[in-house]
């Protein structure tokens, strides 16, 4: 199997999903724009849901690798926060457009719903370990248990899906995760009361 064609399909899907969201993009369109046949598509992916998942996992793995690298470098909280901001901007520019985020919210595909839920849980486990390490290094306030930070992140995700929150961000859905990240990072860097 030619993994180059798989990557061409994934790159094309990422671009189209960013431009239009994944709901509006068909397998036919991905194949047409990638100049790859449908049988070739199905060698690598068993449908649109599978390529959505592959593209999201690829993005997640890249972000996680960079966060693990910055953690290994024992940087300052400021450099770590800068990395978070940069990765968030890159993710918005590469995949998580307003259209893509709306499709995630409006998704009715059970396989994708389960996938996004599992991905979210995996994110929380990773971030718990990440913030625990920062706390052990003295980079975030020692008086706040890492478990509380984890609960804050979980509740921030819930807040992001609340009907009361969504209208405020309907014109700029990417702004909500930015505001949540800003609140989290600036709150962690503050002095104890």
Regions found by a protein language model. Give the residues of each.
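Alpha-helical DNA-contacting segments of helix-turn-helix folds
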Residues: 51-59
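C-terminal effector-binding regulatory domain of bacterial HTH transcription factors
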Residues: 187-193
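Hydrophobic/aromatic-rich alpha-helical bundle segments in the mid-to-C-terminal region
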Residues: 102-106, 135-181, 193
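Hydrophobic alpha-helical connector segments
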Residues: 54, 68-94, 150-153
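Short secondary-structure transition hinges
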Residues: 89-128
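Basic, helix-initiating cap at the start of DNA-binding domains
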Residues: 1-20, 24-33, 50
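Short hydrophobic/aromatic patch on the recognition helix
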Residues: 35-45
């Amino acid at each position: 199997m030619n993994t180059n064609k798989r990557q061409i399909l994934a790159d094309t899907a990422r671009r189209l999903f960013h431009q239009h969201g994944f709901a509006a993009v068909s397998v036919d369109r991905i194949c047409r724009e990638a100049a790859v046949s449908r049988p070739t598509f199905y060698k690598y992916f068993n449908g649109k849901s599978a390529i959505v998942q592959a593209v999201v996992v690829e993005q997640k793995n890249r972000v996680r690798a960079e966060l693990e690298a910055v953690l290994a470098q024992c940087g300052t909280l400021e450099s770590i926060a800068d990395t978070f901001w940069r990765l968030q901007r890159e993710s918005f520019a590469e995949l998580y457009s307003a259209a893509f985020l709306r499709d995630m919210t409006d998704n009715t595909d059970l396989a994708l719903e389960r996938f996004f839920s599992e991905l979210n849980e995996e994110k929380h486990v990773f971030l718990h370990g990440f913030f625990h390490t920062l706390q052990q290094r003295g980079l975030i306030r020692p008086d706040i248990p890492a478990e509380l930070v984890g609960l804050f992140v979980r509740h921030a995700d819930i807040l992001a899906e609340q009907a009361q929150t969504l209208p405020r961000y309907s014109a700029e859905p990417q702004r909500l995760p930015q505001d949540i990240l800003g609140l989290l990072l600036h709150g962690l860097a503050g002095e104890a009361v």
